[in-house]
Amino acid sequence: MIKIAKEKRTFATKFKQMLMKETLKSYFGYDSFRPLQEEIIRHLLNKQDSLVLMPTGGGKSICYQLPALLSEGTAIVVSPLISLMKDQVETLQANGIAAGALNSSNDETENANLRRACIEGRLKLLYISPEKLIAEKDYLLRDMSISLFAIDEAHCISQWGHDFRPEYRRIRPIINEIGKAPLIALTATATPKVQHDIQKNLGMVDAQIFKSSFNRPNLYYEVRPKTANIDRDIIKFIRNNPEKSGIIYCLSRKKVEELAEILQANGINARAYHAGMDSATRTQNQDDFLMEKIDVIVATIAFGMGIDKPDVRYVIHYDIPKSLEGYYQETGRAGRDGGEGRCITFYTNKDLQKLEKFMQGKPVAEQEIGKQLLLETAAYAESSVCRRKTLLHYFGEEYLEDNCGNCDNCLNP
């Protein structure tokens, strides 16, 4: 009897594995899973909570999209940005998957149709902002069958994260009200402190943690002094890397527009992107960049979260980023295909003073956290230690090599 039960279990496991592989191939076009993906998917299908820490380009989305296809009901995916939802939904729909996004950019008819599709069980994945989740908790979410909850960009829940969104703190109470469904939280940037915050605020203290290495060996890190000639330096760099896709990050919208104009005046195919532009122009510029119609996008940090362009060859920071997490996530948009990725940051102490001024007027606790994050970034910029070693140490990962061979400090000690 025991032998028969064991054989049944073995058969069920093999069948599930086969089903997962077939779904991966037929819907996503991949022959095999990336590291950790299969393990995470199996864990979620067994109705267990998971916290996934995986760098940009590691294949996080499939970890909840595939289980959603193999489960009864609709997966609720909480996502912080409308552009992020739009990209994901369009990709899923192109792959023949019933997915939709409930957000403020839809008209009421679209949202009503989506609600009906969810209640009738015709949708496999519903993307929703935390604000919309709060608004729908007493209506739609009570009337539909939910397969799982996926919290994307989970670092937004932490004040120590670089994209803190207070609404993320209200997700767990809502999940508790609605009823039991497995929960998966995912992020590409989480220091040990942020990880602890995610677990505490999402009630995931006992969740299984899946963490892949944060090392991106193909990325070259360099910090250059920021001088009065910075525009000339950037133009020279771009001309030395013709027809390569690149992103340039600036802290202010004004600087984004100024620099985009300077680059255009120097014959460089560049466009601006920031949250203050009208939505049609912003979307057009983003799409032109993705479709290779332009080489360079000059942007604030509003650009990039969830942008799937594997062949970005360089990321330049015109100003020092506000945190090392932000820096890691933004530089991580280079070389996602495993090819060349140059990450160049221009640094001057004056930028720190400017950023500290921006913080004035904010609550004291927020100012203190902001200052500490800024000091860590400044220490990284001024250090003569291997950039890779410093970055990985920040994320709680040990890097044993003395020389990475792919950063300015190691190549020019």
Give the predicted meaning of each segment.
Residues 83:
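Conserved Rossmann-like nucleotide-cofactor binding loop
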